[in-house]
Amino acid sequence: MPDITAKLVKELRDKTGAGMMDCKKALVESDADMEKAVEWLRQKGISSAEKKSGRVAAEGAIGSYIHTGSRVGVLLELNCETDFVARGELFQGLLRDISMQIAACPNVEFVAVDDIPVEVSDKEKSIEMGRDDLSGKPDQIKEKIVAGRISKRLKELALIEQPFIRDTSITVEQLVKQVAGQIGENLRIRRFTRYTLGEGIETDQSDFAAEVASISSK
């Protein structure tokens, strides 16, 4: 019998969203071969991420999080399949964790890369193509470099691509799959809004000058 380590089981679980015991059994049946184990789970219909993704997740909850000092706030809609699950501890914990994640990620604007508008991608490409370090390079090489940079940049904008703040060895997407496997339902991050106190408000110059004058007089 092959040596099935906890690390190997965790890796398979992160990939598939299947339960811990199912992952261990899959690794035993496949002689600890990761790809064969994934295939085994799919054949048995246990690969949660694949099996549940086609089911409608129309229930759920809207969660909120206000960071210490009340300077950052988050509203998040997380969907599941049943109201029963939405009230459960695992679901509510995930809702809270993802809300905190959003609060900690000021650059994140979209749920997934697929949600990013083409205009944003085109703008990033235009910026990258004009960088000085690419001047003089052949077009084919330039395109390859730019494609890699854009891919990285778009992932920075997508919530599910971010390392989970409480366990940076997994992404938010993998976290959702793990909890979906534990709950036994399809889970989906639908949308979110992040608020920052004073965002978009320009400080009046006269007020700023008065502040400086006040400090100088002390």
Swiss-Prot record:
Its main location: cytoplasm. PROSITE patterns: EF_TS_1, EF_TS_2. It is found in: Cytoplasm. Residues 82-85 are annotated as: Involved in Mg(2+) ion dislocation from EF-Tu. InterPro entries: EF-Ts_dimer_sf, Transl_elong_EFTs/EF1B, Transl_elong_EFTs/EF1B_dimer, Transl_elong_Ts_CS, UBA-like_sf. The keyword Ubl conjugation does not apply. GO terms for molecular function: translation elongation factor activity. Keywords: Cytoplasm, Elongation factor, Protein biosynthesis. The keyword Protein biosynthesis applies. It comes from the Bacteria. Associates with the EF-Tu.GDP complex and induces the exchange of GDP to GTP. It remains bound to the aminoacyl-tRNA.EF-Tu.GTP complex up to the GTP hydrolysis stage on the ribosome. HAMAP family: EF_Ts (MF_00050). This is Elongation factor Ts. It comes from Prochlorococcus marinus (strain MIT 9211).
